[in-house]
Amino acid sequence: MKNQKITHLQTRINTNSLRKIIACIIGIVVIIVTTNSSLAGKTENNLLMHHAAKLSKAGKNEEALKIFLEITRRDPENFYAHNNLAMVYSQTKKYNKALKSYEKSLSLNPTFSMSLNNIGNLHMTMGHYDKAEEYLKKSLTYFKTFHLASMNLGELYFKKKQYDDAMKYLKKALIDMPTLSRAHKLIGEIHYLQGRKEEARKEFSIYKKMIEKSK
């Protein structure tokens, strides 16, 4: 009798243990499936973003726009997608929509230097020079060698006729990325405006050679 009770108790223990093991396995499987699904979704979105970027580069902005909108619908916390969507809006001169998308990107990642640079550049295009300066400087705060932010800040100061500041940031942009042809052009224009014709000629010559080489 005593042995039967022990056997019965062992059976219950084994059954409970088995249930716990099965529950644990199911939990692990759910985690793996969820993780794999999430990774698969992210991979698909990355491929779609790459494809949309190629479409935009080819001038097919409306097609690119549809893809980026779909990605942001599927993955609303994808700050890269919101940034890329804003870039297409900007290229199609839908500036208010572009601003909103950049702001969304930055609400998700406030230190994302690309969006900070891009929204700063857009504000410069729209003539909002104070806001442009604020965002471009923030971009450089988080990514000190970001050549595009330095060049855009240099161009902003050029537009404001603050030539010394413009020269400082344009030269910095070239240190960080020596192949920035536009920086040479702007430096040449500053030299020309300040009467340094020979220096201007040299910069324009470098700019011209770079443009021809890139064709």
Which role fits each region the language model picked out?
Residues 44-80, 87, 91:
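Alpha-helical segment of the N-proximal tetratricopeptide repeat
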